[in-house]
């Protein structure tokens, strides 16, 4: 299929052209069967050879984060939306103007030739929003990696106009403490006047190696 067949070819061409190549993939639902999972494993093995960074999202974990009832009808729609959010989050790290900007060079520094990656998004409101958003971002139940001992970390913080310096520092410290002591850590911050007493944090952590994976079965659908 497009994921298991075409994506590794496209990734190889991009890598040969010197283009930063990031794979965001989903694993099959359990009800899709063993054959589907086997095809996924073959596809991910081929893709892994040609991407700089790889983020894996197991469809089976959607039930832990979706507020909707997971039905046969909407299961694949929810999975596709998660993939969209992943691509959008990385794109916005580069393209959205912020008080403290992240640019393409920042993303490249962390994600080039970096192996398995963790991506998490945390959103929280109220008095403890900095701590809660940071904890959610580093422990997303969707991602089959953890960011412990990561060698590269990108932190993007978006907050309401009343966000304090101490809150930014608290969130950044919580996330940084999860990474390797010598990790490259790059962060950006943006104020959003449409938010009210809210903080949103996107974390991308790389350089995890195979030890960053909680499971070894790879992906099914590939962007």
Regions found by a protein language model. Name each.
Residues 1-223:
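Tubulin/FtsZ superfamily GTPase core signature
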């Amino acid at each position: 299929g497009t994921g298991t067949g075409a994506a590794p070819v496209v990734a190889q061409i991009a890598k040969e052209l010197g283009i930063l190549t990031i794979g965001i993939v989903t694993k099959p639902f359990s009800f899709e069967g063993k054959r589907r999972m086997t095809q996924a494993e073959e596809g991910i093995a081929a893709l892994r050879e040609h991407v700089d960074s790889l983020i894996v999202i197991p469809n089976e974990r959607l039930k832990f984060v979706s507020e909707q009832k997971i039905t046969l009808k909407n299961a694949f729609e929810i999975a596709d939306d998660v993939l969209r959010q992943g691509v959008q989050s990385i794109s916005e790290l580069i393209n959205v103007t912020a008080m403290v900007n992240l640019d393409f060079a920042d993303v490249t520094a962390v994600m080039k030739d970096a192996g398995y990656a963790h991506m998490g998004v945390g959103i929280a409101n109220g008095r403890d929003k900095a701590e809660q958003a940071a904890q959610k971002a580093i422990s997303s139940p969707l991602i089959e990696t953890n960011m412990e001992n990561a060698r590269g970390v990108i932190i993007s913080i978006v907050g309401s106009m009343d966000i304090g310096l101490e809150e930014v520092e608290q969130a950044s410290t919580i996330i940084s403490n999860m990474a390797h002591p010598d990790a490259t850590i790059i962060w950006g911050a943006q104020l959003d006047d449409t938010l009210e007493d809210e903080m949103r944090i996107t974390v991308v952590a790389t350089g995890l190696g195979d030890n960053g994976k909680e499971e070894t079965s790879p992906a099914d659908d590939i962007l």
